[in-house]
UniProtKB/Swiss-Prot annotation:
Gene3D superfamilies: S15/NS1, RNA-binding
Subunit details: Part of the 30S ribosomal subunit.
Keywords: Chloroplast, Plastid, Ribonucleoprotein, Ribosomal protein
An example molecular function term from Gene Ontology annotations: calcium ion binding
Cellular component GO terms held in the UniProt record: chloroplast; ribonucleoprotein complex; ribosome
Entry-linked InterPro entries: EF_hand_dom, Ribosomal_uS15, Ribosomal_uS15_bac-type, uS15_NS1_RNA-bd_sf
SMART domains xref list: Ribosomal_S15 (SM01387)
GO BP terms, alphabetized: translation
Localisation per UniProt entry: Plastid, Chloroplast
Name this polypeptide is given: Small ribosomal subunit protein uS15c
Family assignment from sequence similarity: Belongs to the universal ribosomal protein uS15 family.
Protein species of origin: Trachelium caeruleum
C-alpha cells in the first residue's frame, strides 16, 4: 500500500515538469552531454559513446536554434547561457534555465 502511494506521488511530480518542452529537452541533453564527457575522459577509446555525444550535441544545437527563433532571442545569447550553466554546475536545473530564458525574452522586448 505504501509503495503504491509513493509511486503515485513520484508520477505526479514528474507531470509538473513539461518533459516535451524545448527547454526541458535542452536541459536534459546538457546533462547527458556532461555525463558522456566525464565517461569519455575515463574511456578514451569508446568511439560509440563519442558518436552518441556528437549526435546529442547536434540535437541540442538544433533545439537552441529553434528556441532562439521561437522566442526571438539571439542564438549567441542562448549559447552563452548554456556555457554559463555548463561552467557553474554539473547538473542543470530546468526551472533555473526556464527563468533565464524568460529574462532574455524580457530584455529583447
Amino acid at each position: 500500500m505504501v509503495k503504491n502511494s509513493f509511486i503515485s506521488i513520484i508520477s505526479q511530480e514528474e507531470n509538473k515538469e513539461n518533459r516535451g518542452s524545448v527547454e526541458f529537452q535542452i536541459v536534459s541533453f546538457t546533462n547527458k552531454i556532461d555525463r558522456l564527457t566525464s565517461h569519455l575522459q575515463l574511456h578514451k577509446k569508446d568511439y560509440l559513446s563519442e558518436r552518441g555525444l556528437l549526435k546529442i550535441l547536434g540535437k541540442r544545437h538544433r533545439l537552441l536554434a529553434y528556441l532562439s527563433k521561437k522566442t526571438r532571442v539571439d542564438y549567441k545569447e542562448f549559447k552563452e547561457l548554456i556555457d554559463q550553466l555548463d561552467k557553474t554546475k554539473t547538473r542543470v536545473d530546468y526551472k533555473e534555465f526556464k527563468e533565464l530564458i524568460d529574462q532574455l525574452e524580457k530584455k529583447t522586448r
